[in-house]
UniProtKB/Swiss-Prot annotation:
Keywords: ATP-binding, Cell inner membrane, Cell membrane, Membrane, Nucleotide-binding, Translocase, Transport. Belongs to the ABC transporter superfamily. Residues 32-268 form the ABC transporter domain. Its main location: membrane. It is found in: Cell inner membrane. This is Trimethylamine N-oxide transport system ATP-binding protein TmoW. The complex is probably composed of two ATP-binding proteins (TmoW), two transmembrane proteins (TmoV) and a solute-binding protein (TmoX). ATP binds at G64, L65, S66, G67, S68, G69, K70, S71. Its EC number is 7.6.2.9. The keyword DNA repair does not apply. GO terms for biological process: glycine betaine transport.
Amino acid sequence: MRFMGSPVISARNVWKIFGKDPVGYLKTLQPGRSFDDIRADGYIAGVRDVSLDVARGEMLVIMGLSGSGKSTLVRCFSRLHEITGGSIEVDGQIIGDLSEKDLIELRRNKMGMVFQSFGLLPHRTVLDNVAFPLEMRGQDRHTRRKRALEVIELVGLAGREDYFPRELSGGQQQRVGIARSLAIEPDIWFLDEPFSALDPLIRREMQDEFLRLQAMLGKTIVFITHDFDEALRLADRIAIMKDGAVEQCDTPDQIVMNPTTGYVAKFTEEIDKARVVHAGVLARAGVVGEGQPVEAGATVQQLARLLVNDSRDLIPVADKGQVIGALDRQGALDILLKAS
Ligand SMILES: Nc1ncnc2c1ncn2[C@@H]1O[C@H](COP(=O)(O)OP(=O)(O)OP(=O)(O)O)[C@@H](O)[C@H]1O
């Protein structure tokens, strides 16, 4: 397991119901009622009995179609929504129990947020936009300028400090949004479809940039998208939502290899699994291969040439120089040739 230790966010049986008397309604709700049953009763189940943990340093991607409950769930994590049932802990504190003052402190000091609409202040320069949250914190001009310049450099916008938002491309504006939320050094970073307003090429560039940033900063991230490819590229784990519930929460490898519901399987149908599945996941422990090992972090696609040309049935797999098992070449070839 890559992520150990206590979770940063821990959600247990969380419900968020919209309607006239959600708390009263939830009390009378029979187990097993579907989203449509609840709607027939005049309520909307924005979040339906969700339990999940987000580990420190993990990037959890929440994926689902429009209306599946992604934003509502994330709003519950920061208590922008009061939940109807269940509990949410952030850094070991039950956020439902925090006073308004403590909640504001928590949001201000620990949580960063980036949204699809960049939300920049049009009459402020890049520098002043990025420094804005620091100004809100009462930092002096010199300190906030220094920090703002640091994060502007980090997101690749050095030299554009004095530009106004309208003078920047969409991708650059989103970089300003990212820099602004990084300025306060949040422990937990919520990103709600941050790249969906960008055209496909820029979007890909931003994803790469984002992975580079994350490798450097190691933040705990909850990232919302409705784009499965984006989820597969970025996520340590993906939570797939439907009708307010989490259908499956797993690594990209597991989601494409072992979808647990028909709904998740449908999402994975079109995916080129060879691009997602890693040798480390195919390695069977205790099975001994022969010869030169392949790297656990390599995808099946990256190993394509070797898999086709090699004659070994079992190929050893090594993680950080240690052999962890061996993969069945035929099985990997099946993934490559989409036969699995
Ligand atoms: N304030 C609200 N009042 C009533 N219903 C709401 C409210 N906010 C969200 N909902 C409903 O809750 C459900 C989940 O909405 P949510 O915005 O979380 O979905 P989403 O997956 O984030 O969608 P999108 O990708 O379109 O942003 C939807 O049926 C929505 O209509």
